C-alpha cells in the first residue's frame, strides 16, 4: 500500500522521536531538507496553516522562512556569465541506506566523498528528492529534482541540485528506485554500493547563487550549485517517486538583489 502526503506526514509525526539520527537545524537530516529537529509541524499542504506560506509563523526558529532575503528555491533567469573555477567532484562508492522521513526519501551516504567549491571542501552527507522540481529555469518546472547536501568543517552547507525530466530509463538510479521505502519511518539498506558521481550529468556546467535550505528552518548562507543539464528518468521512475512523495516542493522565492552566476565547466 502506498501512502499519500497527509498519511505520510501523520505517520512520520508519530514516529519522529524514533527517527533521530541527528538533531538541530543542520543535523535534523544533514541539511534541513526533511524533518527538522525543532519539532514544529510543517507540511507542503499548499495554503494550509502548516504549509509553505506559513512556515515562518510556526516557530520562532522558522522566522527566516518568511523574513529572509536569500531564500531558496528560485526561478533561475537572467544569470550572469562568469569565469569561475569548476566545482570539483570527488565522489566514492558508498553503502547506502534509504530513509522515508515523511517529507522526502533521503539516501544517507558514507563519509569520504566531497566537492570543492571556491577552494573549500564540502563532505557529501546525503541526497534526496523533490517532486516536482523546486528550482525552475526561465519559468520551466521539471518533473523531479535531486539535492546532494554537503557540509564543510565550519558547518557551512553546499547543495548540488540536479534537474530531472521524463525520458529514458535511468539505470544509475535503478537500485535506489527499486528499494524506495513507502512508509514514513521505514529504512531500506542496499546490498550494492552506489557512486553518486554516476547520478550526475556528464556536463557539470552550473548556475550558482547564495540561498537557503528549502525546508524549515530555511537557514540561509547555503551555496547552491544547480547543474544546467537535466538528466532523464523514465515515466515509471518519476511516477513511482511521486506516488510516495506527492508534491514536496517549496514554491520559488524572490531573488531580491542576489546575483545568479552562470558558469561553463571546462
Show where each model-derived region lies.
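Alpha-carbonic anhydrase
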Residues: 2-7, 12, 20-266
